[in-house]
Amino acid sequence: MKLTAKEQERLTVFTAAEVARRRKERGVPLNHPEAVAYISDWCIERGRDGQSVAEIRSGASKLLGREDVMDGVPEMIDMIQVEPVFPDGTKLVTVHDPIRSDSVGSADDETTESEAATDGGDSAGTDE
């Protein structure tokens, strides 16, 4: 099997995210790389499913709360940027302050209109 550098990176993120999912299910607090991979993988998969950039940004900030990660991790992650492949091409998704004290909830809930604000320049609509 021959993989491009981008495909290898994607598999690395997926593998780290899978470790993070298993640890989270067991109640083990996630470290920095696990938390970033967990959120990044979720964003990438939602892009592939065709969700909008705004929906992904909104949902991603609800995935992990402070109680899900080790002490100090929220302060280390002020922003996560990923480039999911959407049905119409690759776009940049930026999630600011992805781990919030009030963030625990279901990210699969419907996004309200106020949460689904404009991209704010986060989409780079380039095809790959």
Curated annotation (Swiss-Prot):
It holds the Pfam family Urease_gamma. GO terms for cellular component: cytoplasm. Keywords: Cytoplasm, Hydrolase, Plasmid. CDD domains: Urease_gamma. It comes from the Archaea. One of its GO terms (biological process) is urea catabolic process. The keyword Hydrolase applies. Pathway: Nitrogen metabolism; urea degradation; CO(2) and NH(3) from urea (urease route): step 1/1. PANTHER family: UREASE (PTHR33569:SF1). Heterotrimer of UreA (gamma), UreB (beta) and UreC (alpha) subunits. Three heterotrimers associate to form the active enzyme. This is Urease subunit gamma.
